[in-house]
Amino acid sequence: MQIQLHLYNTLSRTKEVFNPQDQANIKMYVCGPTVYDNPHIGNSRSVVVYDLLYRIVIKIFGSRAVKYVRNITDVDDKIIDRAELLGITINELTDKVTQEFHTNMAYLGCMLPNIEPKATEHIDVMIEIIERLIAKDHAYITDNHVYFDVLSAPNYTELSNRNLEEMFEGVRIEKSKTKNHPQDFVLWKPAKPNESTNMNFESPWGFGRPGWHIECSAMSYKYLGENFDIHGGGADLVFPHHTNEIAQSRCAFPDSTYAKYWVHNGFLTVNGEKMSKSLGNFITVRDLMDKDISGEVVRLFLLSSHYRRPLDYNDKAIEDAKKTLDYWYRAIENINVQKIDLPHNFMQSLLDDMNTPLAVKIINDYAKGVFIAKTEKERQLNASVIITCANFIGLMNQTPHEWFNSGVDSLYINELVNKRLEAKKQKNWLLADQIRNQLLEGKIILEDKSDGTTIWRKE
């Protein structure tokens, strides 16, 4: 039976069967970070969601058939402002934040994309596309800027499914007396006086830099061509970023449809509120790492809700994810687990528009199956299913011993355990009990075995 992936396509506003242009060459592009500040928990949701989609597509078509491109936006006004504020060079800032992004994503168990292009290394492709747009009367030069003519683009509002006036309500529009239409957006802008040369480049229209939207059109074209299969990003990118990408790419290449499937993940809030520095609820991935919260816990939290639905970060949600992983790891403890084929019901949940809440429930059901199993064979089968399914979605990459004892001083605990064993040999029951209670206060559980040895685990 042929495996079919169903994805909700924002472009058609329906769930569709994923039918790539070429099953031997699946093309996927995801908008990556703008490297001006450390990634926050909302940024990480997008990366984890598309990491899962990447894994699913690889499972169906094979790793050699999939090309996953995720860009680095290292040209942006926010980068200039941030570097100036910190008193460092632009390159120092972008290198530091890019490295932090990679560290954060490894912490969350994300696979690397096949290609991770930087905007600064593709200025020539951006210039090429802008020249095409000018030649086809979709862009114009004025006041040392190059603007895209929004009214020249067929079906400009197709992705957002709103009329032009509604789309721009509440959106900050760069005012210019020389723009043909207030909603026209910049493709190229001149450098400001005394501005860093690291963020500006020579072009046919003078020394300057590209607008944000042209960057992704250029990098997707460079590595995936005029047409590709999947374009992913956060719901906040539907307009204006993705809307403008479609417009300029289709106008530059009239025979192109650009991306066939548009996939968008929902917003993330913190304790029911929009995350912002002014509210004091801005949480970076580094903040979670510094609190010694396991990356697996954060990843499971991010997958606990359907990717298109809003997700709220709060202490209880993180605690629930930790308890769930504890339950799974406890279920496979002291069992000889083996990698097996993914069960049909689990795979079907992911093929149905990445229904991760159902996938998590299925793993929970198998964990319950371990504890109620009547035979060792049944326990082993259920435990093997747990580890196979969890590994597929990027979880349970530790042994139960490593999981339950992470963050503890094993040498110190072993020293106390040995000291207690010696006390028991000498029938010093008071000291033995004192050591047990001392470890218990640190949430370390001791278990005396019938052979005279003692094992320990974190509560």
Curated annotation (Swiss-Prot):
Its cofactor is Zn(2+). Coiled coil: none annotated. The keyword Zinc applies. ATP binds at K277. Its EC number is 6.1.1.16. Keywords: Aminoacyl-tRNA synthetase, ATP-binding, Cytoplasm, Ligase, Metal-binding, Nucleotide-binding, Protein biosynthesis, Zinc. A motif ('KMSKS' region) lies at residues 274-278. This is Cysteine--tRNA ligase. The gene is cysS.
